[in-house]
Amino acid sequence: MKSCHNFAKRQRALGLGVLGWHSLLQSKNIAFEGLEAQFLNAEIHNIIRERCDRATSKLAEEFGEPEHLRGYGKRNMTTMAIAPTTSSSFILGQVSPSIEPLNSNYFTKDLAKGKFTYKNPHLEQLLEEKGKNNTTTWKSILVKGGSVQHLDFLSEHEKDVFKTFGEISQKEIVIQAAQRQKYIDQGQSLNVMISPKCPPKQVSELLIFGWEQGVKSFYYQRSANPSQELARSILNCSSCEG
């Protein structure tokens, strides 16, 4: 405990992060894959970075600089980190966890007090507008593992907006992580979803690509949902084409 106390006292390290990234994109009708999402990603983390710098400088003026930061005009050694936020996201409005895409648009979750059924609220709103918010539609989504790619009344853009984790190019996820990393002074909880059938060479290439782009580390490598149609290749990405 003494070492923990000394660390906190001398460095005042913090780790401000984000949650609900995929939910935010869906609320704005923006597909996860593409330049529009990348522009918003950069804008958000640039603003957070600027405000963190401003806040830690102000705190240093009010409360002084800790031992390891004397002469730097800052109160905190670190200020930003991307945590998993799985529980926090569920509590704070059932939004998508952290920077991660939603694994499914419709699922049942076992909790201590019983089972909870999650329906993507942004998808539900869209289905309501189209007159398709009914049991038949949701049952078909459930059968497909939470995917909407089979719904013929949705446009291609709408299908892109509501792609699930395994349907999104994993390279796109890594590109966004690399893009925001330059604003973050610590690491990111960066997960990727890869089919067991994916060639090891592709997995290796994805990890090396992340390292080359400046990603500090990966977190979990998850197995893809077999009920969903997977992305053509983990190395493909919409923003890289054309």
Report each predicted region and the residues it spans.
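Structured alpha-helical segments in the cores of large, soluble enzyme domains
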Residues: R10-L25, S169-Y183
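Catalytic alpha/beta core of large soluble enzyme barrels
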Residues: M80-A231, L235-G242
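Hydrophobic/aromatic-rich, well-ordered segments within soluble, folded domains that form packed cores
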Residues: A13-A31, Q202-V215
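Internal maturation/activation junctions in enzymes
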Residues: M1-K9, A13, L25-T85, E156-K159
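Generic secondary-structure signature for well-ordered alpha-helical cores
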Residues: S23-Q26, I30, N46-E65, S104, ...
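Short, compositionally biased low-complexity segments
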Residues: G20-F32, I99, V148-L154
